[in-house]
Swiss-Prot record:
It holds the Pfam family RecR_C. A zinc finger (C4-type) spans 58-75. This is Recombination protein RecR. It comes from the Bacteria. May play a role in DNA repair. It seems to be involved in an RecBC-independent recombinational process of DNA repair. It may act with RecF and RecO. InterPro entries: DNA_Rcmb_RecR, Rcmb_RecR, TOPRIM_dom, TOPRIM_RecR.
Length: 200
């Protein structure tokens, strides 16, 4: 019967809690960590301790911020107040920032609506979003949400909730990935790209 030492079993079990990590991958990572020297392991442990102690969210947009800072770097910077981009998670902000195409302000919902599981948007988070819109008075609100059933449900919900605002509400275009042949594109993506076509 296969039985790992307790410390190894515990590590594998913890690694499996990460999204997309099954037993085989967790096992492989655990054995890789066994080959690390003491300094590397202590650095890793310190990083986890700091993550637990220092993680905090910006009270303005709910993105991640460094510990003694009052707001995140995106709210500190002199950014365009005429555009507000609403995302589901802080990770989405960093993905958009890598594209270097958006210079406006952000707001993190914290979750997407799920018609299947019954998950809702936090009422307090929605209240603060409306306050943020009143303060910034943006001309445009961009919904940068996943192209999924949950993303669609959330976009529809937000459009209704924000109908009182004078800002126009738009959603990221959904269409064909660059460099991909029709052979590899599913019919749903192709249909959305076709219906959302732009003048050329």
């Amino acid at each position: 019967m296969l039985k790992y030492p307790d410390y190894l079993s515990k590590l594998i079990s913890l690694l499996r809690k990460l999204p997309g990590i099954g037993f085989k991958t967790a096992e492989k990572l655990a054995f890789e960590l066994l080959d690390w020297d003491k300094d590397q392991l202590e650095s890793m442990g310190k990083a986890f301790s700091e993550l637990s102690a220092a993680r905090s969210h910006c009270p303005t947009c709910f993105c991640l911020k460094s510990h003694p800072e009052s707001v995140c770097s995106f709210c500190q910077n002199n950014r365009d107040t005429s555009i507000l981009c609403i995302v589901a998670t802080p990770k989405d902000i960093f993905s958009l920032e890598r594209s270097q195409i958006f210079q406006g302000h952000y707001y993190v919902l914290g979750a997407l609506l799920s018609p299947i599981t019954g998950r809702h948007i936090d009422a307090e988070r929605m209240h603060l979003l409306k306050q943020r819109i009143e303060f910034l008075k943006p001309k445009e609100i961009i919904l940068a949400l996943d192209a999924t059933l949950e993303g669609d449900a959330t976009a529809l919900f937000l459009k209704q909730e924000l109908s009182h605002s004078s800002a126009s509400v738009s959603r990221l275009a959904l269409g064909l990935p660059i460099g991909l042949s029709f052979d590899y594109i599913d019919s749903g993506t192709l249909a959305r790209a076709f219906s959302g076509r732009n003048p050329y």
